[in-house]
Amino acid sequence: MSSKVEHPAGGYKKLFETVEELASPITAHVTGRIPVWLTGSLLRCGPGLFEVGSEQFYHLFDGQALLHKFDFKEGHVTYHRRFIRTDTYVRAMTEKRIVITEFGTFAFPDPCKNIFSRFLSYFQGLEVTDNTLVNVYPVGEDYYACTETNYITKVNPETLETIKKVDLCNYVSINGVTAHPLIENDGTVYNIGNCFGKHFSFAYNIVKIPPLQEDKEDPINKAKVVVQFPCSERFKPSYVHSFGLTPNYIVFVEQPVKINLFKFLSSWSIWGANYMDCFESHETMGVWMHVAEKLTGEYLNIKYRTSAFNLFHHINTYEDHGFLIVDLCCWKGFEFIYNYLYLANMRENWEEVKRNAEKAPQPEVRRYVLPLDIHKVDTGKNLVNLPYTTATAILRSDETIWLEPEVLFSGPRLAFEFPQINYKKFGGKDYTFAYGLGLNHFVPDRLSKLNVKTKEIWVWQEPDSYPSEPIFVSQPDAMEEDDGVVLSVIVNPGPGQKPAFLLILNAKDMSEIARAEVDINIPVTFHGMYKKA
């Protein structure tokens, strides 16, 4: 997976350019042959507006939400996109300025207000963004765009129209939830978010939304908290981006990147800050891993500990003979990776991009093994006896279990991120293949397939081409785990090229099957899904 590709032309900067939405879908030019069974839609979310008037957004996660769709039908492809009409977006367009504070951009008070009105606005409480730019997922028969706050946005997956804003606080006890819900084959949705727990201390709640029932009532009305994980620090919850789920267990990784609650509550009301200003790193905490029983909600009081890392994406979690196997995309150390994702850094010339990345934590794909059956007589021993992994779990005299991982992939400044698997058939189960977006000094420049058993790697890469998260789509008559295709949106700013295309790869060997080119630029997208016709 070692990349020799350099990017001196800086074509990656096209990922962070504002674009216009489309009034109607446009037809893509297809080369190659699209599988006849591929009939459906690829839905993607990401930022599409990086400034409002003369005011710039500063962080990668600040731009206004743009919903994308590639439609497949009888070998033809169309592309459509529309801005999500969130309150944040509508007010910004109306007032021609940034109105609501985003992840890394503070929204200054309306300059037209008098001093007294502006003073009062500081003390009217936190106005949380509903800029749902990160992901899109189904709940029952509906589809929602999401970010990491308490707001999700119901959208029409056919027309991309915005339907309504939903505040999850009206249904369950959470302050916000991740943009990485895990969805079971029956349609049950699980997610995790932080909340106030017992004795006014923070905790982390697992929220369950059931599938659509015979009464056709909106499943969100039936959402409930099924598990609560404790917080290691009363007023400093950890940042959580994803979690692990098996048929019988839920895994939560508590990392040393913390949200300072006092700073968070005072930032808007007193000193004017953004979300990024409220994060801090706990340099001595390391990482705590928590496990609960999925069916009963019982928290297992087993103290799993390991050295510090940042975590955003779980690859997969499964059970094997009394152990939980937890595969993660890690960044070594306690420093917050998001510190390196300001747009000014991402838009630098290539040599400066590399210099900035040299200072950042190193990426690594790791496998941790968590023993579930603990006996105190085993103090000092490695409790892992699975023959296929070098990961260890040592029971210490203080009754903590110290975990050391098996490294599945590591490359200098080369990350395997935004992982995807054949989730329908292998989510929460023993599996072999993961697909990832390759980041070269944070620049996405390749697509990779990883065999987690043998560590073999397959790569798709072309000069001056910048992919998105790969989406695996299984073929209808699949006999093997990797029978299917991989879909990715490619920005391609090289001379004589179409600005962007949808790439279709053979999921077995990562060879190109087809591409569907469009005559317009497509900015960066974060996450999405394939919706069958």
UniProtKB/Swiss-Prot annotation:
One of its GO terms (molecular function) is retinol isomerase activity. It is a lipid-anchor. A lipid is attached at residues 112, 231, 329-330 (S-palmitoyl cysteine). Its main location: membrane. It catalyses: an all-trans-retinyl ester + H2O = 11-cis-retinol + a fatty acid + H(+); lutein = (3R,3'S)-zeaxanthin; all-trans-retinyl hexadecanoate + H2O = 11-cis-retinol + hexadecanoate + H(+). Retinal pigment epithelium specific. GO terms for biological process: retinal metabolic process; retinoid metabolic process; visual perception; zeaxanthin biosynthetic process. It holds the Pfam family RPE65. Disulfide bonds: none annotated. Belongs to the carotenoid oxygenase family. Critical isomerohydrolase in the retinoid cycle involved in regeneration of 11-cis-retinal, the chromophore of rod and cone opsins. Catalyzes the cleavage and isomerization of all-trans-retinyl fatty acid esters to 11-cis-retinol which is further oxidized by 11-cis retinol dehydrogenase to 11-cis-retinal for use as visual chromophore. Essential for the production of 11-cis retinal for both rod and cone photoreceptors. Also capable of catalyzing the isomerization of lutein to meso-zeaxanthin an eye-specific carotenoid. This is Retinoid isomerohydrolase.
